[in-house]
Amino acid sequence: MKYLQFLAAVAAVSAFSGPVLAGSSVENTNQVLPVQLTGALFSQVANGQHAERAIKVDNSAQFVPVQGTIAALSAVLNEQKAGKRSFSVENTNQVLPIDVIIAGLSQVLTEQKAAKRDNIVKNTNQILPIEATIAALSAIANGQKAATKRSTAVDNSSQFIPIQGTLAAFSNVLNSQKATKRNTGKVVDNTNQVVPIQGTLAALSTVLNEQKASKRGVDVDNSSQTLPIEATIAALSTIANGQQAGKRNAPDFDVVKNSNQVLPIQATAALLSQIANGQSVEKRNAPDFDVVKNSNQVLPIQATAALLSQIANGQSVEKRNAPDFDVVKNSNQVLPIQATAALLSQIANGQSVEKRNAPDFDVVKNSNQVLPIQATAALLSQIANGQSVEKRNAPDFDSVKNSNQVVPIQATAALLSAVKNLQSVERNAPDFDSVKNSNQVVPIQATAALLSQIANGQSVEKRNAPDFDSVKNSNQVVPIQGTAALLSVVGNGQSVSKRHEGENNIVDNTNQVIPIQATIAALSTLLNSQKAERSYSVDNTNQVLPIEATLAAFSSVLNSQKAERSYSVENDNEVVPVDLVAAALSQVANGQKVTRRGETKESIKHNVNQVAPAQASLSALSDIVNSAHSRRAMDVKQYETLQYAINALQQALDKTNTGDKTHHVDAMTGTAEHFDERDAGLDPAAFLGSAASGISVPVGNKDLLKSLVKRYAAEEDEAMAKRTPSLNGRGQRPRPRNSSSSEHNNNGQCSVGEAKCCSQVITDEGKKKTLAGLLGFNNLVGDIGLNCQQIPVLGVSLQSICKATPVCCTNVSQDGLVNVGCTSIPIN
């Protein structure tokens, strides 16, 4: 899989990557390994995210994180859409995360929508997208509305309410996201809820942030509602941070009394001085039960201080055991708490929590409540922020006593000085009589922001549940989010991936992963849009759609994300590497590509999953485009594999939204649209196709390039003249034979690239970097050939044909003036 490493190569000042690995020999394992690291200075910014999944069960687990971002001195529009459909599958999991983001001196509009439907599955699991962002120096309004969902013919209905909130700019900015979920099954006695989260903004003027959520259940014994949450903060600059957590139970079980909960967390602080904000969560097992020993409790904690003076904000959590039950003694309570205030003038921040017991049941007397958390404000004027969450008991069950709750999470920090924000969550489920099931959630978050440096990291570890007697089931969700911002523009995004491993037909369970979003902006224009669509018709499908979008600072900016998946079932193997780069006043490049390969075995020929590759575009104050790919010397097989991926991208240009099982998506149209406006004589499709393969890129300063080539060529000739003279009096150019860096083929053949006869070959690292910078390359493998001509025939007559230096070059630019990625050809 070396070509994956190549596809993940990025162009910018620095790069960050970290592997996310999952085991392959466990019957049932659910991991969530989100990784996020973001730093921002006035010079450099790095942002990366990784996602990996391994699966070998009859169940499908999808993960579709989305990240989008923009900023500019002019109008910017950023849209992301993700759609996924499943046909003829017993169990289907869809994820429709969406995110988008903005900032600029003019109006910006961004919308996100997420919808999911399940038509053939008894039980449906969904995941809520998240949105969070920013603030400005003028008035900012942020509203969130939650969609209404009704269930008509099911004993129990599963709904969730989307979230919206956030905008920022020197003028008006609107950012919204919607999510709806419907459950059409009629045989499910189980309830799954997911609570979305929203957090955002502040300014020097009045800021209003509201969220409303309503849900109704029709013709159902019980109605499950979920109320979203909103939290915000503000400083003198732009700050946005949001994170969401959701977890849902697998389909109905015959003899399983199981309960799965997810911990919400909230922490936040802001002020002109240092602020420390931490929160921890602990879960205790409920008392012993007669029939089922199952109890899930969550005790989140929040503390925050902020102000030019001292501010102390604490929150306490109490948990009460549910009443005695006739058949099942099971109690699930979650009592989160949040409170916080900070500002030079008046700040009001309140949150209330109420818990109500569900109505009496004939068979099961069970009560499940979820109490949301929220609180936080900071600003030179007034800020009000509140969030509430309510959840009611699931209906009666004939054979299953089960209840699932999900609590959202939000955390944010910002200030002109140091800011630190930590949050941890840990939960262990008790032992069960008939089912040994354990659910752990260990999210971690840390964030700091200064006037110069910003570091944001998050790690998540998940442990495998113990062996099960009758059901091997384990569901974990670990959302995390943390973020910080400078006096200038800083964005932070993070994604979460979840993996499920197990033998086929052992688990009929579904695992979900929570996407996370954050965002950014720069002094120049950035447009980043990404689309993803999937279609499949197999019993099991695994997709990973990581997306990352960009940022820009006063200097170079690097932003990359990678996603890798591998699993050992008769399923398609996809690779979704993503890369994008953005630069500041001089260079801005943003690109991301997604390639995917389907297995060709006869038994799974019908299983072809395509991932709509992401689109990223560029636009800067100078005419420089930076290709995010650089070739490396590779063998024939590797080259063919790479070329296959490149061809797949190019073929997708004219196949958009076909809607068939082998779904093709236009990979580069969005980018190509913008080249027509900037370069009238440029063929966008041809340019992007070439740039994708790293063959040629336009040069911002051609005169400077030609001048340097002329000078370097003269210096190389002068150095050659000082070497051992040849018969014609000129220096004899070296011709290495079978060196470690040369092509290992007989008769001077090139396994990769084209054979060139170059008058000069630049090996000096300093000169190579200078030329590479002008060409738009950041990472080069091999040397650079100058004044080269193609060699028509290789082999025995090579010496007579090429009087200069024969090389194999993988990248050609500027009509042979400069050839990149050159390696010497051994002459026999």
Swiss-Prot record:
* Sorted UniProt keywords: Cell wall, Cell wall biogenesis/degradation, Cleavage on pair of basic residues, Disulfide bond, Glycoprotein, Secreted, Signal
Classification via Pfam families: Hydrophobin
Please list which residues make up the signal peptide.
1-22
Task: Write down the glycosylated positions.
Answer: N156, N222, N738, N811
Xref: InterPro entries: Hydrophobin (IPR001338)
- Knockout mutant characteristics: Does not significantly affect surface hydrophobicity. Leads to complete loss of pathogenicity when rsp1 is also deleted.
Q: How is it modified after translation?
A: Hum3 is an atypical hydrophobin that consists in a repetitive repellent-like region that spans 578 aa which is separated from a hydrophobin-like domain by a spacer region containing three possible kex2 processing sites. The repetitive region contains 17 amphipathic repeats of 31-36 aa each of them with a C-terminal putative kex2 processing motif.
Give GO MF terms, alphabetically.
structural constituent of cell wall
SS bond partners: C750-C808, C757-C802, C758-C788, C809-C822
Compartments it resides in: Secreted; Secreted, Cell wall
| GO cellular component annotations of the record | fungal-type cell wall
State how it assembles. Self-assembles to form functional amyloid fibrils called rodlets. Self-assembly into fibrillar rodlets occurs spontaneously at hydrophobic:hydrophilic interfaces and the rodlets further associate laterally to form amphipathic monolayers.
Q: What does this protein do?
A: Aerial growth, conidiation, and dispersal of filamentous fungi in the environment rely upon a capability of their secreting small amphipathic proteins called hydrophobins (HPBs) with low sequence identity. Class I can self-assemble into an outermost layer of rodlet bundles on aerial cell surfaces, conferring cellular hydrophobicity that supports fungal growth, development and dispersal; whereas Class II form highly ordered films at water-air interfaces through intermolecular interactions but contribute nothing to the rodlet structure.
Q: To which protein family does this belong?
A: In the C-terminal section; belongs to the fungal hydrophobin family.
Q: Print the miscellaneous field.
A: Filamentous ascomycetes and basidiomycetes generally contain multiple hydrophobin genes. In contrast, hydrophobin genes are absent in the genomes of the yeasts Cryptococcus neoformans, Saccharomyces cerevisiae, Schizosaccharomyces pombe, Kluyveromyces lactis and Yarrowia lipolytica, and the dimorphic fungus Candida albicans. These organisms have probably lost their hydrophobin genes during evolution. Mycosarcoma maydis does have hydrophobin genes but the encoded proteins have been functionally replaced, at least partially, by the repellents.
Q: Under which name does UniProt file this protein?
A: Class I hydrophobin hum3
Organism this protein belongs to: Mycosarcoma maydis (Corn smut fungus)
Question: Which gene underlies this protein?
Answer: him3
